[in-house]
């Protein structure tokens, strides 16, 4: 959520609501030769991943990642109804961008089934994205860790506007808790209590919690 720029005394300024513990990373610089790498090894890798119907969600979650993942999912769903493998390794990021990817996974899954594969760490907004997959199609690699916690936001401005944004964050927290309760089978009360602080889980603990269906050790185990 963004507010307009202007005099700090009368304009509320809010950072996007986050689901992580990390500060915003600097945006990558756009170089003139970025569009001239069609034959580069990176482009070849992206092409092969696309042909194999694999999507990587690695790093912080922001609007650029959301746009890229949305485009890939829609393009893949438009070419075939075969399964799409989505790999998630993320510390989290902006809730709104996570919401976009979460909803798009649900949207595309009605056309082409999506396998969610957790690896590394699946934290915060990354866990929100991961939870978009069907329960039976949520898997992870053996050493994956998962983190659930409440959203955070920053705002400054008139006290009335700060109060409004604080209430919105509470609503967001309640909405996210409902999502995780539904997707894990836990009660809303338990999820609310667990996410009041950083709630870490190993792969096996995430299975017991209901977030992960099973651990896989090879690509041949994907359906």
Swiss-Prot record:
Active site residues of this protein: 124, 149
Region (Disordered): 1-40
UniProt feature, compositional bias: Acidic residues: 21-32
Keyword Hydrolase attributed: yes
GO molecular function, one term: ATPase binding
Function: Cleaves peptides in various proteins in a process that requires ATP hydrolysis. Has a chymotrypsin-like activity. Plays a major role in the degradation of misfolded proteins.
UniProt protein name: ATP-dependent Clp protease proteolytic subunit 2
Gene for this chain: clpP2
């Amino acid at each position: 959520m963004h507010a307009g720029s202007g005099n700090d005394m009368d304009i509320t300024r809010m950072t996007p609501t986050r689901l992580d513990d990390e500060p915003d990373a600097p945006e990558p610089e756009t170089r003139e030769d970025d569009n001239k790498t069609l034959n580069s090894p990176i482009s070849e890798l992206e092409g092969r991943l696309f042909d194999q119907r694999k999507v990587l969600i690695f790093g912080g979650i922001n609007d650029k990642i959301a746009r890229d993942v949305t485009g890939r999912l829609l393009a893949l769903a438009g070419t075939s109804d075969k399964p799409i493998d989505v790999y998630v390794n993320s510390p989290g990021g902006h809730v709104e961008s996570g919401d976009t990817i979460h909803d798009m996974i649900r949207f595309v899954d009605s056309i082409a089934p999506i396998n969610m594969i957790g690896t590394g760490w699946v934290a915060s907004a990354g866990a929100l994205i991961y939870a978009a997959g069907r329960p039976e199609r949520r898997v992870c690699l053996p050493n994956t860790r998962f983190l659930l916690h409440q959203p955070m936001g920053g705002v400054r401005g008139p006290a009335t506007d700060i109060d409004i944004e604080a209430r919105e964050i509470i609503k967001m927290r309640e909405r996210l808790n409902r999502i995780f309760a539904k997707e894990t089978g836990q009660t809303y009360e338990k999820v609310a209590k667990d996410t009041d602080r950083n709630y870490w889980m190993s792969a096996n603990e995430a299975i017991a919690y209901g977030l992960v269906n099973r651990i896989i050790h090879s690509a041949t185990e994907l359906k």
